[in-house]
Curated annotation (Swiss-Prot):
Any Pfam family the entry gives: Ribosomal_L28e
UniProt keywords, alphabetically: Acetylation, Cytoplasm, Isopeptide bond, Phosphoprotein, Ribonucleoprotein, Ribosomal protein, Ubl conjugation
PANTHER family for this protein: 60S RIBOSOMAL PROTEIN L28
Lineage summary: Eukaryota, Metazoa, Chordata, Craniata, Vertebrata
Cellular compartment(s): Cytoplasm
Subunit and partners: Component of the large ribosomal subunit.
Cysteine disulfide partners in this protein: none
Family: Belongs to the eukaryotic ribosomal protein eL28 family.
Residue(s) carrying Phosphoserine: S115
GO molecular function: structural constituent of ribosome
Matching InterPro entries: Ribosomal_eL28, Ribosomal_eL28/Mak16
Name of the molecule in the record: Large ribosomal subunit protein eL28
Gene Ontology, cellular component aspect: cell body; cytoplasm; cytoplasmic ribonucleoprotein granule; cytosol; cytosolic large ribosomal subunit; dendrite; postsynapse; presynapse
Organism: Mus musculus
């Protein structure tokens, strides 16, 4: 079944849809922007890209759909864990998408998603407030 036909079926009646604040969001896997649109849908396309946080809380996991074996959902995804510094992680995601000519329209969305995940994994440094000495009169 073509992606366009699947989109016509799924676009208004999917278990992943969330409609609130006059906008429609989607919680499906491999939807990089969580937006209910044809381009970012993670279920209907033959090639999809997903970026998730790693299980141990350090790094990201890039999920890509295989071209072959589309009828076998258990083996249709390739998961690659990237546990490097931020610049190397974003660079390797960029190369995975660009060098393989794999959905170039999703490149920037995948990089931004990975950047947000890496930023959230950074430890937060608590700044101590400076207290002024009390005035004695």
């Amino acid at each position: 079944m073509s992606a366009h036909l699947q989109w016509m079926v799924v676009r208004n009646c999917s278990s992943f849809l969330i409609k609130r604040n006059k906008q429609t969001y989607s919680t499906e896997p491999n939807n990089l922007k969580a937006r209910n649109s044809f381009r970012y849908n993670g279920l209907i396309h033959r090639k999809t890209v997903g970026v998730e946080p790693a299980a141990d809380g350090k790094g990201v996991v890039v999920v890509m759909k295989r071209r072959s074996g589309q009828r076998k959902p258990a083996t249709s995804y390739v998961r690659t864990t990237i546990n490097k510094n931020a610049r190397a992680t974003l660079s390797s995601i960029r190369h995975m998408i660009r060098k393989n000519k794999y959905r170039p329209d999703l490149r920037m969305a995948a990089i931004r998603r990975a950047s947000a995940i890496l930023r959230s994994q950074k430890p937060v440094v608590v700044k101590r407030k400076r207290t002024r000495p009390t005035k004695s009169s």
